[in-house]
Amino acid sequence: EDELKAAVQAAERLYKNGCLAPLGVCWSALLAGQTLETALAIVPRQERFYADHVRGEDARTFVIVSDALRYEVAQELTERLHGRLSGNTVCTAMVGTIPTITPVGMAALLPHKKLTLTEELSVLCDGMRTDASQREAVLRAACPQSAALELGVFRRMTRAQRQEIAREAKVVYLYQDVIDRAGESDGDVFAACETAMSEIEQAMRMLVSELSAACIYVTADHGFIYTRSPLEETDKAERELAAGDVLCYKRRYAVVRENVSDERTLSMPLTMLGRPEWACVTPRGDLRFKQQGGTSPYMHGGLSLQELVVPLIAYRNRKAGQKGYRAITKADIVLLGENRTISNGIFTLVFYQQEAC
């Protein structure tokens, strides 16, 4: 047990010091002195999701929004879906909306012409509130045949109830909160990621088999930074770095009324939220602002690669004969080696898979 703990600690140090820290430094250097629009101009933006993918789609569209589904988790989910769902599944990336928090990311994924951050720090879509109870109204303002509900509620419905929703709605948003809930409550984030992937896969299989879904998207409001070990003092930045008229101060970000620059922080104007005179200030790399009681290793809100990049899984259910159709078949394997005789109770067999995954 002691050896296992030592191995876990060594792996954690290697990840933090050999990957997370240097990657954070390089990423911060890329963003420094620029806006997201200029620094990442060639990457699709989260706020354009509905306009680019949902509006104008002929097929009934299902959108699964998983709170804090990080890009790497979505990539693993995509690899699983390749072997379990016929059709075509592709995972690409989008640039999230800052600060990378749930109210902002969820609003950005809804239909809108303009996003607005209010003085109370709530986000409006064309003047409409975007909290959970109001998202269906925002969707219906763009497409009257829309529905929004929790993924868990949808999965617990009877087949007839799910079919009734599909008959009445052209656009269905399904919301999942597994990863973020575990992270915010100091739960096991790794286990939560596995649960989230399993639930999404089951939901997609259900949508395809029961409702003949031809177009499914899976995306997220934001990503996250996570390490197993609690934060140390060296992981924290002084609160004074968030200078100016501070409207909101959290461990990974602060919203200030003026765009101030400091070599120890990144400061981005909130242009996408209709507040170009305001700024989101975050410590460079993976540091956190000092805050009483702030020791949780799960974090989001900042501008790191892990927080800012959100996935977009696009699934198309192609039928046989259609372009892009991919049938699920069992792979052929052959036994390597000439020896076909088992001479004792301990032996090794080496197989070769003839087709690529």
Describe the function of each predicted region.
Residues 1-357:
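Feature captures the catalytic ectodomains and active-site-proximal regions of enzymes
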